[in-house]
Amino acid sequence: MSADQTATAAGRNAGTPLHTDWFDAARVNLSAAERRSATLITRRSIKKNFQAAWLVRAIECIDLTTLAGDDTPERVRRLCEKAKRPVRADLVEALGLGHMPRVGAVCVYPTMVESAVSALAGSAIPVASVATGFPAGLTPLPQRLEEIRFAVAAGAAEIDIVITRAHVLNQNWTGLELLSIKWPLV
């Protein structure tokens, strides 16, 4: 199916139908996977001048996150300041980077999005927000959708959704309601 065929009247990509046969037959040899993963830490790490480059790249992929029950606008502001300068200036100079690395985003609860957007103004660092009943995803769909709307209206550029894990454990893939959660909400 082409992208043109999946677009709706609102210009939204409608997604593709769920084909569980793509993964229903997949099997994992758990003991082999565990053995293989245990060897990952013994493998040769990135060395010398490549190490710094990969560490900088890791910083650029990280979302600095605060999802504490006692978050405050001040705590979020401090996190945003760290996001603007994730590496000490002397290290940036010593590495010859020529610029301060930028984190991928700052991620906060929906009620803290405005504080983060304000603190990051002019920095080009996007604000992400968890939504849809973090951390368990056990709230009704209308409430999860409203949480997304609230975060986007407050300035969130990215929404990290939480799925209802029971649907996965029970292999109820259509119960995940992912198409309902796609932005823009319908």
Q: Where are the language model's segments positioned?
A:
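Alpha/beta enzyme core
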Residues: N49-R57, D70-P101, T111-V186
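Alpha/beta catalytic barrel-like cores
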Residues: M1-L95, G104-A105
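Short His-Asn-centered micro-motif
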Residues: V106-P110
